[in-house]
């Protein structure tokens, strides 16, 4: 897992497929954030966030 400054800056951007805004994650994988963008109530682990949103299969 790659460290990110999400907890400090509110922005997690790891790799081309991962960008979460206003999330609380402290670590993230290159292809996956363990957090959801605002408006997403819950993300399943292993989901892939694209842009500022999660796919419908990722959000619960």
Curated annotation (Swiss-Prot):
Keywords: Metal-binding, Metal-thiolate cluster. InterPro entries: Metalthion_dom_sf, Metalthion_dom_sf_vert, Metalthion_vert, Metalthion_vert_metal_BS. A divalent metal cation 5 binds at residues 33, 35-36, 49. Residues 1-28 are annotated as: Beta. SUPFAM superfamilies: Metallothionein. Gene3D superfamilies: Metallothionein Isoform II. A divalent metal cation 2 binds at residues 6, 12, 14, 25. A divalent metal cation 1 binds at residues 4, 6, 20, 23. The keyword Metal-binding applies. One of its GO terms (molecular function) is metal ion binding. A divalent metal cation 6 binds at residues 36, 40, 43, 59. The keyword Cell membrane does not apply. Belongs to the metallothionein superfamily. Type 1 family. Class I metallothioneins contain 2 metal-binding domains: four divalent ions are chelated within cluster A of the alpha domain and are coordinated via cysteinyl thiolate bridges to 11 cysteine ligands. Cluster B, the corresponding region within the beta domain, can ligate three divalent ions to 9 cysteines. PANTHER family: METALLOTHIONEIN (PTHR23299), METALLOTHIONEIN-1X (PTHR23299:SF24). Metallothioneins have a high content of cysteine residues that bind various heavy metals. This is Metallothionein-1. It comes from Cyprinus carpio. The gene is mt1.
């Amino acid at each position: 897992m790659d460290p990110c400054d999400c907890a400090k800056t509110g922005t997690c951007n790891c790799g081309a497929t991962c960008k979460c805004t206003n999330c609380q994650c402290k670590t993230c994988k290159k292809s996956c954030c363990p957090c959801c963008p605002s408006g997403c109530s819950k993300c399943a682990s292993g989901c892939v966030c694209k842009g500022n949103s999660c796919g419908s299969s990722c959000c619960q």
